């Protein structure tokens, strides 16, 4: 085996993530925060909200007990979030939701 100094260093594009092996290289909390900002972009618009999203917003703020972390809240409401992004054709948010679902949930 050659010296480690002569081995090719892995670049981010070379690294594949697998949460069943390790969470190294997976930014679940960071991606969840970004995803929450995408959610709020829609549900904070009075034209796009409803009673469920009012409840979700209150829950996210800790209004119904302890404040859950973003990842838990996303995991618990994955289908509703997917439906929201599909309804408003938010492909960027859907792509990140897929990443979070596969890597973190």
Curated annotation (Swiss-Prot):
Keywords (A to Z) from UniProt: Nitrogen fixation
Biological process per Gene Ontology, one example term: nitrogen fixation
S-S bonds: none
Entry keyword Cytoplasm: no
Domain of life: Bacteria
One Pfam family this sequence matches: CowN
Family according to the record: Belongs to the CowN family.
HAMAP family for this protein: CowN
Biological function: Is required to sustain N(2)-dependent growth in the presence of low levels of carbon monoxide (CO). Probably acts by protecting the N(2) fixation ability of the nitrogenase complex, which is inactivated in the presence of CO.
Protein name as catalogued: N(2)-fixation sustaining protein CowN
Classification lineage: Bacteria, Pseudomonadati, Pseudomonadota, Gammaproteobacteria, Aeromonadales
């Amino acid at each position: 085996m050659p010296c480690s100094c002569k081995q090719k260093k892995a670049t981010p594009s070379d690294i594949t993530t697998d949460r069943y092996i390790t969470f190294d290289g997976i930014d679940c909390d960071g991606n969840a925060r970004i995803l929450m900002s995408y959610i709020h972009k829609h549900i904070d618009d009075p034209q796009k909200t409803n009673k469920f999203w009012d409840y979700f917003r209150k829950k996210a703020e800790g209004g119904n007990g302890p404040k859950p972390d973003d990842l838990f809240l996303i995991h618990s409401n994955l289908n509703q979030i997917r439906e929201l992004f599909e309804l408003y054709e938010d492909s960027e948010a859907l792509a990140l939701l897929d990443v979070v679902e596969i890597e973190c949930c």
